[in-house]
């Protein structure tokens, strides 16, 4: 349960950093004042990152809520609930990984540019924006690790529901040696 809270908090932190990240730059080109603005909503990959982090944060929060108030019995989780949790953990881990990877590519192009297609880098102009984007992406990758760990844990819990029945062996049932 603690790891779900950590994943939720990490996703919220990454979401807030990216959603609030904005920078306005004023340039003087040939005597003309030019205003340039950078914010996450201008880049689809960053919008995807914000929504993915929000989805993970809400899911983890709702599952923690359900576990705390025993809406889902943690110890005696039935097969259907174990399957649902496993599939959602897996799916959201992959969604978050895809969002982080897409955002990393966009951030890389913003930082380095791409000479083959004539795209220049923009982080020298929007340094503060690029730095916060980088921090948000790093936090998202940490959240991906938390979700991947949760996926392994939920898979283990699921596979235990298909394990052999364990019965207690009394001293009378022990085989003679």
From Swiss-Prot:
Transmembrane segments: 1-21, 49-69, 81-101, 132-152
A Pfam family per the record: CASP_dom
Coiled coil residues, start to end: none
Gene Ontology cellular-component annotations: plasma membrane
Keyword DNA-binding attributed: no
Membrane topology: Multi-pass membrane protein
Residue intervals annotated with topology Extracellular: 70-80, 153-177
Keywords: Cell membrane, Membrane, Transmembrane, Transmembrane helix
Principal cellular location given in the protein's record: membrane
Compartments it resides in: Cell membrane
Positions on the Cytoplasmic side per record topology: 22-48, 102-131
Complexes and interactors: Homodimer and heterodimers.
Assigned protein family: Belongs to the Casparian strip membrane proteins (CASP) family.
NCBIfam families xrefs: A_tha_TIGR01569
Protein name (database record): CASP-like protein 2U1
The organism of origin for this protein: Osmunda lancea
């Amino acid at each position: 349960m603690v790891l779900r809270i950590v994943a939720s908090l990490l996703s919220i932190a990454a979401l807030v950093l990216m959603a609030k990240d904005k920078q306005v730059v004023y340039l003087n080109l040939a005597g003309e004042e030019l205003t340039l603005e950078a914010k996450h909503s201008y880049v689809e990959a960053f919008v995807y990152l914000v929504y993915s982090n929000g989805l993970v944060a809400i899911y983890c929060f709702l599952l923690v809520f359900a576990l705390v108030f025993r809406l889902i019995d943690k110890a005696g989780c039935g097969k259907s609930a174990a399957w649902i949790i496993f599939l959602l953990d897996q799916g959201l881990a992959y969604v978050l990984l895809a969002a982080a990877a897409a955002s990393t590519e966009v951030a890389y192009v913003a930082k380095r540019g791409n000479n083959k297609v004539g795209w220049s880098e923009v982080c020298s102009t929007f340094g503060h924006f690029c730095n916060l984007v980088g921090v948000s992406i790093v936090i998202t990758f940490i959240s991906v690790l938390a979700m991947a760990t949760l996926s392994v844990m939920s898979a283990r819990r699921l596979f235990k529901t298909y394990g052999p029945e364990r019965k207690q062996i009394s001293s009378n049932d022990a085989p003679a040696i």
